[in-house]
């Protein structure tokens, strides 16, 4: 299907369908969604979650304590926000059941750039997916069920059409009351339309923002009289009223109130009755206007605190369902957020050197975590990401211990994902000759930006400390391994020679025999053999050489039996491979000709250098980055 046909089909699918009141009631009998509340339709749009048994994944089992967690496909790209999303869904679930949440404002509370607006936007998109039914021509999208009285008609509607009585508490709008009078009480003259909520047309989805303290009034929520119509209608006539307020437009849908607590308190008053009683008063002297929708608000913590501390606002506080939306605290998930942002920009095709996003993520999360007791902050970050530190940091605690000590406000401060993304944008564009990112430029840009942001002195020192004391040394170790593996592949023959020599020396040393080198005629006694073996073992810090040598010789003897009497390849035994790699990599003089970008002394060296660069490029670096990172690594190594 081409794009034009696809658009036409979508437009046709969401067109209004008109029907009689009798047909609508028959539809109610067939399909409970015909009379569903906004919360029920939202649940339908969100859909069923997929469950993940975290016992089957070592990393997730540590993070979620072996629990079965729910993941909602509708929020698949909201990484690291499982708790917040589950609370939002719980709100809709309880509201759909007709519980107290139905009468409350869903309030997303969190730091700047933490994802509140993204959740709100996603909920508005989901609201558009399931249609609702309204009286045709109603300026407030009111439900046809408002025409019926629960006391008089409830039993009949429940028996004949299966409509539970709790759906019959809606009232008629003043506009519908006037039409009913005009029709002489004949409800059959009302027509019903099936409509899809629409953000663009402001049908059952609306956004309200705080205005100026002096000129914003309740009309932004409840509407006001239309002066142009006063020539035809009296001021208190429902037809002279402009139902353009947020509560009017969002009936049977969702009203988003951005930065709600920045609005003057007088503006918020209609929300009290709209949520609790399902209706609100307009600015003119006619009856109440129905409201059966969801009010979604969000703001930063500072506004919430000042609002909460004002005793005059107690009536509101009891009508708010708070969902905290903290920053992501898991490195792996934070990386996914950056990848998503980069993917949706022109940087998606640019080279991002391995370790860049991880370093940015680690820095961001270090700023968000609360300092633990008797443990390092870096270890806490690794534990939060599901790593097992049992063997590497005996002082590391369990994830629950860290959380208990940190309290409920962890993740509500630190640098935002928005800040991190701006840093990454600068890093990608740091080099004027190529659009690419690498960790060395990232560290430089981070330090510059920390100074420019004018944080408090102690915060600035702490953040710079994260870069210099935690991230830089670990990156030096990481890039060292990257260079090492690319370098060693140029020396597979050299590695095999060391392996064969080590095995021979160890075998003679164990048997306490002298060894004569067949090429040079040199003789090694047990002491000389030990000295040669230690040259290989010492860079790797082998604690018990005797056991290690026995272990290696036994392995090689077994391997020879199935390899026609030949030694296995030097990379086949992980323990000895590591020892040989460290031995080969311990001598910078041997390393320099291959990884440095100076003029080469021989064609052989030049070939090895080219092979090294090619392998680094295959790992995900540009040629320019290979040079920069190698030079940075050699400088760091020299200074240490």
Q: What are the roles of these predicted feature ranges?
A:
Residues 1-40:
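Long, basic/Gly/Ser/Thr-rich N-terminal segments
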Residues 32-640:
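Conserved ASCE/P-loop NTPase catalytic core
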């Amino acid at each position: 299907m081409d794009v034009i046909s696809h658009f036409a089909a979508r437009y046709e699918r969401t067109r209004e369908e008109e029907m009689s009141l009798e047909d609508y009631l028959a539809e109610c009998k067939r399909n409970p969604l015909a009379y569903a509340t906004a919360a029920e339709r939202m649940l339908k749009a969100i859909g069923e979650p997929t469950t993940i048994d975290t016992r089957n994944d070592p990393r997730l089992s540590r993070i979620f304590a072996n629990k079965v967690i729910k993941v909602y496909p509708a929020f698949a790209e909201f990484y690291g926000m499982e708790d917040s999303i589950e609370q939002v869904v719980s709100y809709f679930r309880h509201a759909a059941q007709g519980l107290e949440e139905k009468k409350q404002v869903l309030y997303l509370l969190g730091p700047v750039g933490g994802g509140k607006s993204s959740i709100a936007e996603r909920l508005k998109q989901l609201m558009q997916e399931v249609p609702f039914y309204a009286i045709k021509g109603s300026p407030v999208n009111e439900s046809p069920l408002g025409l019926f009285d629960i006391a008089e008609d409830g039993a009949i509607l429940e028996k004949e059409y299966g409509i539970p009585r709790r759906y019959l508490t809606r009232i008629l709008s003043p506009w519908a009351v006037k039409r009913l009078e005009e029709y002489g009480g004949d409800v059959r003259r009302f027509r019903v339309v099936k409509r899809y909520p629409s953000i663009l047309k402001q049908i059952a989805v609306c956004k309200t923002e705080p205005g100026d303290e002096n000129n914003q009034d309740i009309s932004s929520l409840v509407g006001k009289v239309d002066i142009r119509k006063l020539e035809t209608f009296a001021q208190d006539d429902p037809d002279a009223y402009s139902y353009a307020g947020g509560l009017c437009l969002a009936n049977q849908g969702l009203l988003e109130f951005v930065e709600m607590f920045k609005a003057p308190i007088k503006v918020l008053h209609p929300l009290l009755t709209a949520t609790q009683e399902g209706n609100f008063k307009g600015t003119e002297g006619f009856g109440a206007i129905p409201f059966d929708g969801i009010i979604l608000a969000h703001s930063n913590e500072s506004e919430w605190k000042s609002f909460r501390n004002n005793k005059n606002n107690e009536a509101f506080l009891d009508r708010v369902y708070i969902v905290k939306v903290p920053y992501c605290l898991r490195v792996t998930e934070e990386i996914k957020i950056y990848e998503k942002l980069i993917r949706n920009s022109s940087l998606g095709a640019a080279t991002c050197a391995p370790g860049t996003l991880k370093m940015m993520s680690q820095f961001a999360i270090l700023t968000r975590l609360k300092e633990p007791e008797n443990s390092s902050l870096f270890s806490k970050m690794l534990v939060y990401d599901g790593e097992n530190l049992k063997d590497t940091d005996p002082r590391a605690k369990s994830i629950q211990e860290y959380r208990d000590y940190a309290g409920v406000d962890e993740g509500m401060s630190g640098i935002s994902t928005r800040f991190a993304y701006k840093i990454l944008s600068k890093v990608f564009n740091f080099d004027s000759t190529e659009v690419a990112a690498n960790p060395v430029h990232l560290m430089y840009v981070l330090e510059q930006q920390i100074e420019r942001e004018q944080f408090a002195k102690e915060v600035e020192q702490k953040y710079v400390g994260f870069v210099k004391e935690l991230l830089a040394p670990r990156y030096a170790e990481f890039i060292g391994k990257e260079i090492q593996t690319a370098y060693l592949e140029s020396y597979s023959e050299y590695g095999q020679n060391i392996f064969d020599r080590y095995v021979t020396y160890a075998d003679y040393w164990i048997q306490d025999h002298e060894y004569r080198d067949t090429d040079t005629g040199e003789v090694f006694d047990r002491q000389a053999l030990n000295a040669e073996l230690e040259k290989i073992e010492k860079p790797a810090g082998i604690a018990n050489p005797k056991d290690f040598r026995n272990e290696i010789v036994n392995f090689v003897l077994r391997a020879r039996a199935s390899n026609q009497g030949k030694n296995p390849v030097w990379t086949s035994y992980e323990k000895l491979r590591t020892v040989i790699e460290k031995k080969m990599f311990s001598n910078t003089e041997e390393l320099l000709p291959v990884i440095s970008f100076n003029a080469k002394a021989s064609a052989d060296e030049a070939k090895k250098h080219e092979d090294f660069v090619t392998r680094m490029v295959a790992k995900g670096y540009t040629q320019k980055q290979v040079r920069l990172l190698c030079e940075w690594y050699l400088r760091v190594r020299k200074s240490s």
